[in-house]
C-alpha cells in the first residue's frame, strides 16, 4: 500500500511532460522537395515525375530541439536531365501535423510559368518547451 501511495505522490509532484509529436505529409511534389530543420537537410524526395498523388510522411520529432525550430521546405523544378530549363509546371502540397492534428500547411503551383531550380520556399516555426 505504501508503494502505491509513493508512486502516485511521485506522479503528482513530477508530472510526465510529453513532447508533442510533429510530422509532415507531402501529397504533391513536382518535381523534388527538400526539408530542412534548423538548416540541416532531413529529407530529400529525389525526383518525382508525372505529378502523382502521394502520401509521403516524415516524422519531424527526432530533429526538433527545445525552443524555436525552423522548418524550411524547398521545391526544385525539373528532372534528372535538367528539364527545369523548359519545365514551367510545378506544384507542391503538404501538411504539418502536431499530435495528429493539422498544424500548418503549404500549397502552391506555377501561376506565372516560372522555370528554374528552386521555385518555392516556405518556412514554418515549431516551438518546443
Stretch-by-stretch model annotation:
Residues 1-5:
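Positively charged n-region of N-terminal signal peptides that target proteins for export
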Residues 54-58:
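Short strand-edge motifs at loop-to-beta-strand transitions and within beta-strands
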Amino acid at each position: 500500500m505504501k508503494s502505491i501511495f509513493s508512486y502516485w505522490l511521485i506522479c503528482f509532484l513530477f508530472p510526465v511532460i510529453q513532447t508533442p509529436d510533429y510530422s509532415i505529409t507531402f501529397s504533391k511534389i513536382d518535381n523534388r522537395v527538400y526539408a530542412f530543420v534548423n538548416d540541416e537537410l532531413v529529407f530529400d524526395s529525389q525526383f518525382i515525375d508525372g505529378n502523382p498523388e502521394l502520401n509521403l510522411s516524415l516524422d519531424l520529432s527526432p530533429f526538433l530541439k527545445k525552443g524555436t525550430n525552423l522548418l524550411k521546405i524547398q521545391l526544385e523544378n525539373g528532372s534528372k536531365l535538367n528539364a527545369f530549363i523548359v519545365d514551367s509546371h510545378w506544384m507542391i502540397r503538404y501538411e504539418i501535423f502536431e499530435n495528429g492534428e493539422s498544424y500548418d500547411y503549404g500549397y502552391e503551383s506555377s501561376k506565372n510559368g516560372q522555370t528554374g531550380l528552386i521555385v518555392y520556399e516556405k518556412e514554418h516555426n515549431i516551438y518546443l518547451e
